[in-house]
Amino acid sequence: MNIIENIEKNDFSEIELAAIPFNTLADHYGSALAKEQLALEHESYELGERRFLKMLERQAKAGEIADNAAAKPLLATLLPKLTTRIVEWLEEYASKKGRKPSAYAPLQLLKPEASAFITLKVILASLTSTNMTTIQAAAGMLGKAIEDEARFGRIRDLEAKHFKKHVEEQLNKRHGQVYKKAFMQVVEADMIGRGLLGGEAWSSWDKETTMHVGIRLIEMLIESTGLVELQRHNAGNAGSDHEALQLAQEYVDVLAKRAGALAGISPMFQPCVVPPKPWVAITGGGYWANGRRPLALVRTHSKKGLMRYEDVYMPEVYKAVNLAQNTAWKINKKVLAVVNEIVNWKNCPVADIPSLERQELPPKPDDIDTNEAALKEWKKAAAGIYRLDKARVSRRISLEFMLEQANKFASKKAIWFPYNMDWRGRVYAVPMFNPQGNDMTKGLLTLAKGKPIGEEGFYWLKIHGANCAGVDKVPFPERIAFIEKHVDDILACAKDPINNTWWAEQDSPFCFLAFCFEYAGVTHHGLSYNCSLPLAFDGSCSGIQHFSAMLRDEVGGRAVNLLPSETVQDIYGIVAQKVNEILKQDAINGTPNEMITVTDKDTGEISEKLKLGTSTLAQQWLAYGVTRSVTKRSVMTLAYGSKEFGFRQQVLDDTIQPAIDSGKGLMFTQPNQAAGYMAKLIWDAVSVTVVAAVEAMNWLKSAAKLLAAEVKDKKTKEILRHRCAVHWTTPDGFPVWQEYRKPLQKRLDMIFLGQFRLQPTINTLKDSGIDAHKQESGIAPNFVHSQDGSHLRMTVVYAHEKYGIESFALIHDSFGTIPADAGKLFKAVRETMVITYENNDVLADFYSQFADQLHETQLDKMPPLPKKGNLNLQDILKSDFAFA
């Protein structure tokens, strides 16, 4: 039975024909725009349904329908039934004397729930991709899947440490059963050769055993669930008489009904052609028709989480979100024309545009069939290209969607983007195509309401142009000088961007191209030129800025430009400089390479391994060159909870692996060792640069850890205090609840078939409880994100009420508006930062909100509030580069 064909398409006409929103919109904007807006909202649901069903069809063809949300509840319902039947069958024959069934011994090798899960997944996969299959084919496939799990699962179960350390990550990087299995065969052979797994090779099951296992599981599946049924075909015809398996119609209907329901609540939200519906409650804002899935003001993980906000009085928060989404935008047609022209070029001048075609694989060596070393080297090079190609395809699909949306709305005089918030209070645009996207998306959008640029606006336009070119780490006069030096280049790009592609060489090419067009407009029309290009003022490592301000930390504050300075303080560059100083010392005086002996904990086998000394590692990094780009992500994420181990992975992913893929990282002979060495240097350097921020993060973690701890009486073991979530309120009145809970389900891990969460049985059903580890590790990033979210919202309201600014381009720590109002926003962003931390001691407020929840035995364990420094918050008002 074909599930896709049985899905009944949704009728979304209630959206387009909704009378109340139509009448409201018609009264304000006319019936034509009212009709168009509701048609767009209707279309968003149709597009979402199409996307969902396309994904479902793709998964069905690939045999992966069990991974779709439509099938997961069915699996969760059937899994306990089949598991129980398998347990009963095993127990029945365990107590019987005499010869056991052929399937008995093999099925004892797996946990019953694992056998049940594999059965459901394999049978669903085979029947949704082919409608029906012979029982022999299904049994053979199922029996083989059971054997594979028994065979390779022993690596995970018997050699757990080895699997975690050396196998799991590499296994997860491989996609497709064939590649995963080939990899595990190599791993298995290597482990057996080294005496692991008892030194015994797997004794493969014969075809008869495989068939017995498969048929017995299919029989139990039919007995316990009725998921499949046997149909006899061509009865009496000796040549073609056979029994086939197919999904029972009731389950086809269940899957089709759920898939249809999910498809109906998966809209691909689009921009609006009228101002979004104002937020006045926690649901129902943004889009005018409610639809099947009305927007929520706060993105939470559950309805219960959302309802916490129902009675919260937070007028400033509502005001800010409504101002953000009331900003009118339009498509920048000049930039759009250029993108449409170049995006399909084979040699696109913009390096970041993903190409239409895959990079060619390296030529195979002539002796590849006989030279194992050559084959291995070629495979390694090809693997890098395949990995890059997967990312290319994903980026290309995203690019084409954004471009399609830009072309779709290009004729509109104005469009709007509904906004809402995550649970920490960070403000997000709802449609996929929005002003918070990448450089191309931002370049394709401009504000709809401009003003005569004026002299001050022209000044800020030049600063913006230099920033887009990457000339943003120098004082303003030098940025202006850069623009004035390149006036001819800028005007040439504006006149003929297809043939003059200097703009494509800049740091943010499409935003720079948009600047070129506006600069040419001012040049040709003078200071009365009406300019609507959004100019952005970006924070300087925002997380550290907020920690430094709340702690009055002069050292950290200076490093992130909170204090006035003649030059731009670049914390990423400062850390890179400190790292380079150590590298130069280590290159001369560092430790030498050494061969170290490694003893296998399980087998006692001793082997030798080359450990690079700090001298060699330093020389490798000096040869590569450590700049701010190497340290940037690690320093930036420090305020968001990243530590030395996290730095290591970041360095590996962001610097070393791309360098190796591009051929520029050949010096890194031991990538993991090079990453670990650099991570330690960055950690040490940043820890002495922003001491107060690190102290505040540790203090927050201590608080979250104590709140998440269960307090028991030492003698009676009576629980004196249950684990608590963490709650605080931001300066503008937004309440934040951090409540990570342990999942109720138990996770079932398969070697090849992924993961599944088992619903607990009646006997094991308990409150999941607070996840203490996540509470502790999440508090620092979530707390500082909530503070920058509050600062953004306060800035929007303040800038509107004090300076009359109406248009806002907002991305968390980036504040933008039109050039004529840029000078006002430049002041507003600093003034609200000062107001926030002069009027609020956010750490003390946080402490006061949870102190009474601590048990008396915990009070001594809570460290005192971090000490404050001598930073004068008023100095932020005089800092050119705090947000620049």
UniProtKB/Swiss-Prot annotation:
Question: Key word Transcription present in the record?
Answer: yes
- Any one GO molecular function term: DNA binding
What InterPro entries does this protein's entry cite? DNA-dir_RNA_pol_helix_hairp_sf (IPR024075), DNA-dir_Rpol_C_phage-type (IPR046950), DNA-dir_Rpol_phage-type (IPR002092), DNA/RNA_pol_sf (IPR043502), RNA_POL_N_sf (IPR037159), RPOL_N (IPR029262)
Catalytic residues, chain numbering:
D538, K632, D813
Query: What EC number(s) are associated with this protein in UniProt?
Result: 2.7.7.6
* Naturally occurring in which organism (per UniProt): Enterobacteria phage T3
GO terms for biological process?
DNA-templated transcription; DNA-templated viral transcription
UniProt family annotation: Belongs to the phage and mitochondrial RNA polymerase family.
| Keywords associated with the record | DNA-directed RNA polymerase, Nucleotidyltransferase, Transcription, Transferase, Viral transcription
Pfam families for the chain: RNA_pol (PF00940), RPOL_N (PF14700)
Highest taxon in the source lineage: Viruses
Q: What is this protein called?
A: DNA-directed RNA polymerase
Gene name tied to this protein: 1
One GO location term (cellular component): DNA-directed RNA polymerase complex
PROSITE patterns for this protein: RNA_POL_PHAGE_1, RNA_POL_PHAGE_2
Show the catalytic activity: RNA(n) + a ribonucleoside 5'-triphosphate = RNA(n+1) + diphosphate
Annotated function? DNA-dependent RNA polymerase catalyzes the transcription of DNA into RNA using the four ribonucleoside triphosphates as substrates.
